[in-house]
């Protein structure tokens, strides 16, 4: 809905007379100045009125000729007019929804170098975006906070390797919001320099998780494994070294970027290997109910019997499905001491709980569930509400 601006007409209450000490030229200049300000205010007020759909613009009612005002317009007043089409357009609620339109101006930071799986996930979400490589995940977050980029992409879990625990800590450490999720099928390829055969490879470089996901294939080939910073860096290292007995495990895109041959595809042990990525931004999305949504939260609980059961029951009582639950120790307070009446003091590990549930914050069930959860939680924070990625 467009915003409507009403004009404000300012007229002096007292009648202006020419002072005996004011010359004729000064009087005319003063008159022209007041007239120009009047005309500029009138014109701007008429243009500022934006008609709402189904309504008649107010400009017809406000339009007055110079003759009605008893004034004669001078050409000098035209210099005061300004093209209001150059000013920012009124902000609407639709402006904050995620858009599937032009994304050519979106800049997305990721950890790694060109060819990394994180970059592929960013291009899947925004095919025309500009990707910005960062050395560390922390730097990718900071790039968004410093307005150097618009969004950041973060791998959060893999269907084989499980959760990436350190990245959960980053979600709490930074004040960014999850606005989208991306499920990326993983196709691990064995890469080598041009002209090399698979049997020539004696040593392979890749990210530790990629190596773990290809254990059976690498054991069958009898290849030694060496950890690298990420898959794309491994491909770049093999390409620059030129060694015929050294290979890399990386993506097809990395092979194309660094000029390597694909010696084998889909060498991961699980053919249905999928990595889930999160897209983060400075501002949250406005939740909707027109399609399936997911909400991610983090909270901590007071110590007590059955308190975790009670916390999870607030979702079960409202038929809200939990798709993910992850516990992480509180770094600032890893242990909690509880005094007993006769048995001394007991020490408990103090945990944070990360939960993904399948409901939008616009859904009253989710609102009531979180309100109920506050009765048991000592801390709660919504990390984001975003559309579910249903495309595989």
From Swiss-Prot:
Function: Converts the prephenate produced from the shikimate-chorismate pathway into phenylalanine. Dehydratase that uses arogenate and prephenate as substrates. Utilzes more efficiently arogenate than prephenate.
Pathway recorded for this protein: Amino-acid biosynthesis; L-phenylalanine biosynthesis; L-phenylalanine from L-arogenate: step 1/1; Amino-acid biosynthesis; L-phenylalanine biosynthesis; phenylpyruvate from prephenate: step 1/1
Principal localisation: plastid
Transit peptide location: 1-48
Cited PROSITE patterns: ACT, PREPHENATE_DEHYDR_1, PREPHENATE_DEHYDR_2, PREPHENATE_DEHYDR_3
InterPro entries named among the record's database cross-references: ACT-like_dom_sf, ACT_dom, Preph_deHydtase, Preph_deHydtase_CS
An example molecular function term from Gene Ontology annotations: prephenate dehydratase activity
Record-level GO BP terms: L-phenylalanine biosynthetic process
Keyword terms of this UniProt record: Amino-acid biosynthesis, Aromatic amino acid biosynthesis, Chloroplast, Lyase, Phenylalanine biosynthesis, Plastid, Transit peptide
Expression tissues: Expressed in roots, leaves, stems, flowers and siliques.
Alphabetical list of NCBIfam families matching this protein: PRK11898.1
Species: Arabidopsis thaliana (Mouse-ear cress)
Residue intervals of the ACT domain: 296-387
Pfam family, one: PDT
Catalyzed reactions per annotation: L-arogenate + H(+) = L-phenylalanine + CO2 + H2O; prephenate + H(+) = 3-phenylpyruvate + CO2 + H2O
Lineage, top ranks: Eukaryota, Viridiplantae, Streptophyta, Embryophyta, Tracheophyta
Name of the featured protein: Arogenate dehydratase/prephenate dehydratase 1, chloroplastic
Localization annotation: Plastid, Chloroplast stroma
Residues in Prephenate dehydratase domain copies: 107-282
GO CC, alphabetical: chloroplast; chloroplast stroma
EC numbers on record: 4.2.1.51, 4.2.1.91
